[in-house]
């Protein structure tokens, strides 16, 4: 069975596709794992529920795919379930070994869409009936709790941010979600809450950290991950192409594609590289340690930047 796992391939047409089923599958997990790997490598954001196996358990193997393939970690988000008191729900699996790419979200007593498998013939609901095509989903609404309620919350946040930042790639959207999360529990990334509770109010103001390996606690670091030193942002100019030559290539037609501003204070060991013909304004007091490169277009610093700033021929500060 694929139990309550939300696999969200965030399509760049500003819609989301979610699979949140409890239906049996006729084959093993290898084809599903291959599909997840392929989706992540083709620019999709994979949002996975951590599972409902109590706080002291850790996520199952499929959530740990980035340990085998660290190149997809930035396109993966694992989600735990918070109670109304911002505590990890007693039923929720903790972030555990996935903490460096895990966040938390409300998932207790959520009124939402639900679906149940029912037999078309009045028979049993089991694998054999599924294989025969005798089952269908009866949709409806109801109150549910669990990480399968928390994960769609994060999917919704990602969808809003893809509209807010139409020029960003899925891995950059993931970075914004992680770095703007409200810290819970032990300071910083921890094994229960990961980066913390997702915070859309802060996320719409841009990233709060340019992440590198140095920003991840050693006990949660996935070897080979967070290897990029620069957050490369392409403000392309109105009507120009972003992520060209990829499966998510698209024309950027929103006003943010021509001018955008980030007002959060940005920290971290990474740096910023500005590309594209448009303008990006930094409004916060930024302490990130990496270099700032203006390769194309305009970077307006209306707050402050502590790093070294370099300007190439077609760039303007």
Language-model features: locations:
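Tight coil/turn sites that cap or link beta-strands
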Residues: 236, 245-247, 251, 296, ...
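C-terminal subdomain of the subtilisin-like protease fold in secreted/lumenal serine endopeptidases
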Residues: 75-78, 163-241, 249-251, 255-256
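Surface-exposed loop/turn positions within long extracellular repeat scaffolds
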Residues: 57-61, 171, 194, 265-267, ...
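Extracellular S/T/G-rich loop segment that most often corresponds to the catalytic His/Ser-adjacent loop
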Residues: 42, 66-159, 163
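Substrate-binding/access-modulating region of protease and related hydrolase catalytic domains
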Residues: 1-71, 135-145, 149-151
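Sec/Tat-exported extracytoplasmic proteins
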Residues: 40-43, 50-53, 80-83, 95, ...
């Amino acid at each position: 069975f694929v139990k309550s796992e939300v696999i969200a391939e965030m399509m760049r047409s500003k819609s989301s596709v979610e699979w949140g089923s409890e239906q049996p599958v006729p084959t093993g997990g290898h084809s599903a794992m291959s599909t997840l790997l392929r989706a992540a490598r083709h620019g999709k954001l994979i949002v996975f529920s951590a599972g409902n196996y109590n706080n002291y358990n850790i996520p199952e193997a499929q959530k740990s795919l980035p340990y085998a393939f660290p190149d997809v970690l930035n396109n993966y988000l694992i989600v735990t379930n918070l109670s109304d008191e911002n505590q990890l729900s007693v039923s929720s699996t903790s972030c555990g070994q996935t903490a460096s790419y895990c966040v938390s979200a409300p998932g207790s007593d959520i009124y939402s869409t639900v679906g149940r498998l029912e037999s078309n013939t009045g028979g049993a609901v089991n694998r054999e009936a599924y294989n025969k095509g005798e089952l269908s989903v009866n949709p409806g609404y109801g109150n549910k709790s669990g990480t399968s309620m928390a994960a769609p919350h994060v999917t919704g946040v990602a969808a809003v941010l893809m509209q807010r930042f139409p020029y960003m790639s899925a891995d950059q959207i993931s970075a914004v979600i992680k770095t703007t999360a409200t810290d819970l529990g032990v300071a910083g990334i921890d094994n229960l809450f990961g980066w913390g509770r997702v915070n859309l109010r802060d996320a719409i103001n841009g990233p709060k950290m340019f992440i590198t390996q140095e920003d991840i606690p050693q006990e949660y670091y996935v070897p080979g991950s967070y290897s990029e030193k620069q957050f490369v942002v392409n403000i392309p100019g109105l009507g120009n192409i972003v992520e060209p030559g990829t499966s998510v290539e698209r024309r950027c037609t929103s006003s943010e594609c021509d001018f955008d501003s980030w007002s959060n204070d940005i920290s971290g060991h990474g740096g910023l590289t500005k590309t594209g013909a448009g303008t990006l304004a930094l409004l916060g007091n930024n302490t990130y340690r990496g270099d700032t490169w203006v390769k194309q277009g305009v970077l307006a610093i209306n707050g402050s930047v502590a790093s070294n700033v370099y300007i190439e021929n077609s760039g303007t500060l």
